[in-house]
Amino acid sequence: VMPRWAALRWSESQPWAALGICGATPQKRPTPAAALLKGLLIAAGLLTVIASVVLLEGSGDWRGEVDATQLTNAVLLCLGVGFAEELIFRGWLWAELNQMLGSRRGAVAQASIFSLVHTRFNLGLGAMSGLLVGLFLLGMVLARQRQSDRGSLWSCIGLHGGLVAGWFLLQSGLLELSTNAPAWLVGPGGSAPNPLGGAVGLISLLILLLIQRTAVAKAARPATGARNAS
């Protein structure tokens, strides 16, 4: 559906390239495998920071237990959620918003929508606010990642999917959170916390976003935005 939409709505002769899945100018984009691996490594780095602070603070214990079923589920989560959601949010939605609002406002708008769609509104105001901000920052990080990869979506897929799959593995047996672990640290959500809404997650995402902005500025790309990057 989306490739056909890109071909008709955007008058693209290479709709998959416009969506960031394959490259119209492959010499300027990282290979899908390299970009996917880069995204996975960034996700692993973020989760390592969060888990390390949790362990050092005494709010969890390292168990290191994981089985084949959990690994299989993690891989499916990584590729399924990462591919589907990035194709929708950073592939299609961002391009549509760019056409209506321009590159900068389009990036903010897609991150805002991404945050609202994923936030749990049954939480208290403070917890919900932290989660909204964390998810917004993640949406901006993913947009910057696509920009830095010259329109390729594969690093975004690896980063997004890696965070989902990695946190699933941590909660499934690698890391046991204490029942009294503070929400400001592990994130809101009670027994199923989202670390992106906690202090460590927020600070880590903000630092990553600043690093990405510097990298994009240094690259001095001639055009910005999801469509132009494609």
Task: Walk through the language-model features, giving the residues of each.
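Small-polar-interrupted transmembrane alpha-helices in polytopic inner-membrane proteins
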Residues: 47-50, 78, 82, 102-119, ...
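C-terminal membrane module of polytopic membrane proteins
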Residues: 161-230
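Hydrophobic alpha-helical transmembrane segments
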Residues: 36-41, 71-75, 104-109, 129-133, ...
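Membrane-interface helix/loop boundary segments of multi-pass membrane proteins
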Residues: 84-109, 144-152
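Juxtamembrane helix-loop-helix connectors linking adjacent transmembrane helices
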Residues: 12-88, 94-100, 184-185
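Aromatic-anchored segments of alpha-helical transmembrane domains
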Residues: 47-53, 111-121, 161-173
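Functionally important transmembrane alpha-helices
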Residues: 128-187
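Hydrophobic core of alpha-helical transmembrane segments in multi-pass integral membrane proteins
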Residues: 1-6, 43-55, 196-216
